[in-house]
Regions:
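N-terminal capping/linker segments that flank leucine-rich repeat
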Residues: 1-90, 109-111, 130, 151, ...
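Conserved hydrophobic position(s) of the canonical leucine-rich repeat
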Residues: 71, 81, 92, 102, ...
Length: 281
């Protein structure tokens, strides 16, 4: 019993640790920004002095670096990281690890995370099932073939273009106000549950229809580079919210020289303009 009690105390008081590996050689520098609570984090594998909330340049003494401390915000943007271990960093609320060489990212222990920026890596999967507080997600320019957002009901901004998504279920993300899912392989996009949506960028997919009748707050729509034509393009423009007596909305339905399957007739343009939308074709 005593041994068990000691074990529990040890675990509950465990320090928060971030570990990363970089392809940069020893002697080169990395630029990091950290916000932390309490004492300055302890560093191994690099020299420098952390200053909370400020970008600091560190010199590598090893290609594997360990940061021990209560770091709540960690920005390691563009440092040639090949691995990032956050499984012992429970205090983290915001992570910026974009423009690196990460092939995996385990966030299962970062339950306090509200903002995630992991674009321009080599991620093939992203498990966000434990990150229920997540409100801002930027994961563009990876190799994601699936993205399960069913546990992320607090999500407000989603930026996931330039992946390999064939399906995107947004039915659980009713707080969503901005969505960019362009340059994927989507054939269907249902935004009927996203009534707070103000911006939708879904260009460069394979959509044949788009119903916006529930999106009364929408002000900005880019849907060029799809396959919406005939009766479906007419249904789309008729479903646009009426912005009469409001700031004009912006609707980009055709854009050259992008491969274009949309067909928008003058009569369709007139319908959109009649609802105070600026139409770019």
């Amino acid at each position: 019993m005593c041994a068990l009690l000691v074990s529990v105390i040890t675990l509950s008081g465990a320090a928060n640790v971030i570990t990363f590996t970089t392809a940069k050689a020893v002697g080169k520098t990395v630029k990091l920004t950290m916000t932390y609570k309490g004492n300055k984090p302890k560093l191994t594998g690099m020299t420098g002095t952390p200053v909370s909330g400020e970008e600091v340049t560190y010199t590598l003494t090893s290609q594997t670096v360990t940061i021990t401390g209560d770091v709540t915000y960690f920005d390691c943007y563009c440092n040639q990281l090949t691995a990032l271990d956050l499984t012992h960093s429970n205090a983290l609320t915001m992570l910026v690890c974009s423009v690196n060489q990460l092939t995996a990212l385990d966030l299962s222990h970062n339950t306090a995370l509200t903002e995630l920026y992991c674009s321009n890596n080599q991620l093939t999967a992203l498990d966000l099932s434990h990150n229920t507080a997540l409100a801002w997600l930027y994961c563009s320019d990876n190799q994601l073939t699936a993205l399960d957002l069913s546990h992320n009901t607090a999500l407000k901004t989603l930026d996931c273009p330039n992946n390999q998504l064939t399906v995107l279920d947004l039915s659980h993300n009713t707080a969503l106000t901005e969505c960019s899912c362009s340059e994927n392989q989507l054939t269907v996009l249902d935004v009927s549950k996203n009534t707070a949506l103000t911006e939708l960028f879904c260009y460069g997919n394979q959509l044949t229809a788009l119903d916006l009748s529930k999106n009364t707050a929408l002000t900005w729509l880019r849907c060029y580079g799809n396959q919406i034509k005939g009766e479906e393009i007419t249904r789309l423009v008729k479903s646009l919210p009426d912005r009469t007596d409001k700031e004009a909305g912006e609707f980009i339905v055709v854009q050259e020289p992008a491969p274009e399957g949309n067909r928008c007739l003058k009569t369709d343009v007139a319908i959109a303009k009649g609802k105070n939308w600026i139409v770019k074709v």
